[in-house]
Amino acid sequence: MAGGNGIIQAKKLDDGFLLTDYNGECFHLKSVKELKKALKKHLVNRTYIIQQEIESFTNTGEKIDFRIYIQKDYTMKWKLSGIETKIAKSGSVVSNSKYRARIEPGELAISKYYNLSKEETEKKINEITNVCIQVLKRMEKQGYLLGDAAVDFILDKSANLYLLEVQIDYAAEIKAFREEDEQRVLPYILTTPFEYAKALAGF
C-alpha cells in the first residue's frame, strides 16, 4: 500500500510471536490464537499478500530498500537517471519518509552494504537497470504510455534483486521541500522528461 500503510511484520520467537505494524508499534503474542486475533484486528476488509521477509539491512541492522529512476531522454529511449537508497529508522518495517532515517546515493550504498567492488557495483546496477527497462517495456505493450518511472526494489543479503513496485506518478517535485539528502537526485531526474517532451514535439 502507498507509503507503507498496511504493512505488518510477524516474527516467530521462542516464546511466541512479535507483530510490528507500519507505525512501529510492537505486540508480543504468546500463542497462534493471540496472533490470529491481532491479525484480524489489523487486517480490515482488504485482500493482503503474505510473503516471507527478504532480509535487506545495513551493517547496523536498519532496513533498506532502493529506488531507481528510469526515464526517456532526447533519444526517446529508456535510460538510468538516478538511484537512491532509503534507510529506515531503527526498528521500522518501512522506509517511507515518515519512518526514514536518511537517504544515501545508490551506488555508494550498494558497494558499502554488499561489499562489492566498483566494477561489481557497476555490473549490478546495469543488471537492475536492464530488468527495470524490460518491465517498463512490457507495461508499454499492455497499453501504458510511459516516459518517466521510478522502480522500488530491494537486494537480499546476497545482492539478488527483488522488484517491489513501479511508480509512474511519484511526484518528484515534493523532494524540493524535503531534506538535502533527498534532493540530491533532483538535478538528474527533473530535466530529462523535458528532453523527451521536446523530442516528441519534434524540436
Regions found by a protein language model. Give the residues of each.
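Generic beta-strand hydrophobic packing signal
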Residues: S81-I83, A149, V166
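Conserved catalytic-core segments centered on acid/base and nucleophilic motifs
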Residues: M1, I8-Q9, V151-L155, L164
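Phosphate-binding site of ATP-dependent enzymes
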Residues: M1-I103
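C-terminal active-site "lid" helix and adjoining low-complexity regulatory extension at the edge
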Residues: L108-L146, L155-F203
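A short glycine-rich, hydrophobically flanked beta-strand micro-motif that places a catalytic Asp/Glu
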Residues: I49-E53, D65-F66, K141-S158
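Flexible domain-boundary/linker segments
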Residues: T85, R100, L145, A149, ...
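Acidic-enriched, low-complexity/disordered segments with a strong bias for Aspartate over Glutamate
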Residues: D14-D15, D21, D65, D73, ...
